[in-house]
């Protein structure tokens, strides 16, 4: 009895370690959203021009997730995590030292390389190390690391950038990553590659219409979200006319609400993943459509950001659950594809927001994002009725 108890504690501790790593990786992915104005000022550029960095980062991840995963499919996972953290840390040092926007983009590409591998293996590792029957909860814990990156990492990174310069934000992330690396070395066991799949897995996965439908849903809904979210900081200051401090508070609210979404999914995700995801997409649609009307009031924007954060966390978790349920025999390949497709959506959304801001008006980003959100809602209803599946069923 004691052994089992200790075993469960150790299992959860390892999952928590991965959650901390997720926090670090998502902090660096999200933090430029809160630093666009500062970086633009530093390099004498427009905010929308700097925003293209978000698209470059996301599309590098999208392009490299599957190739890197296949290249490292036989590498022991603990060793792989250590190596990618070394690349991650070195790239942040370069971000700190960057003397031009081009160098900053190059450093972000290095981070994106590490990101591409990390997110293709993390979800399956969390499920693998979780106590029996706690797979959805393990995923929820990883997602909590993601949410904390938004509720703590992004606002703190923005505050550091405001008071000490945006370079110090990236340097601080590098320090945090180094500490996390030491923890990984200490706590994680040897993790031989299991069920990672190979290039031979791709035709099999592509012949699963339910899985392909989930991938399509993912890219559409993520595009909708990032069309507006990528430029929420300049939107709050330049369109709504509120202070930089309120922009920080709004990002804090949105991230904190993500934790609520994580808790909701942890309790209901095993049984009601499909219904939760469709409801969350509908909620996202409403939030995007109301973004500009809500911009006349700090309270209205605050309430909207809470529902927005809840919706996106449930959507992200739900998509992962579906992918893992539909590809239990090739989890790493399936998640590498998912990570790549998710980042195609991030890059597409950031690019659409960039073009809307440059050639139309930044005030329209919510309305434009609502269009793919509506398409995603209809598609989710169709596919979830046709292919209902939960994580615990592990149905192909």
From Swiss-Prot:
Q: Which UniProt keywords apply?
A: Cell inner membrane, Cell membrane, Membrane, Sugar transport, Transmembrane, Transmembrane helix, Transport
Cross-referenced PROSITE patterns, in alphabetical order?
MFS
Asked whether the keyword Cell membrane is assigned, the reply is yes
Its membrane topology: Multi-pass membrane protein
* GO MF term set: carbohydrate transmembrane transporter activity
SUPFAM superfamilies cross-referenced by the UniProt entry? MFS general substrate transporter (SSF103473)
Query: Per its UniProt record, what InterPro entries does this chain match?
Result: MFS, MFS_dom, MFS_Efflux_Transporters, MFS_trans_sf, Sugar_effux_transptr_put
This protein's major location comes to membrane
| Compartment list | Cell inner membrane
Residues passing through the membrane, by range: 15-35, 50-70, 81-101, 103-123, 136-156, 170-190, 209-229, 246-266, 275-295, 299-319, 333-353, 364-384
Which domain of life, per UniProt? Answer: Bacteria
Q: What does this protein do?
A: Involved in the efflux of sugars. The physiological role may be the reduction of the intracellular concentration of toxic sugars or sugar metabolites.
**Family per record:** Belongs to the major facilitator superfamily. SotB (TC 2.A.1.2) family.
Name recorded for this polypeptide: Probable sugar efflux transporter
Name of the gene this protein is made from: sotB
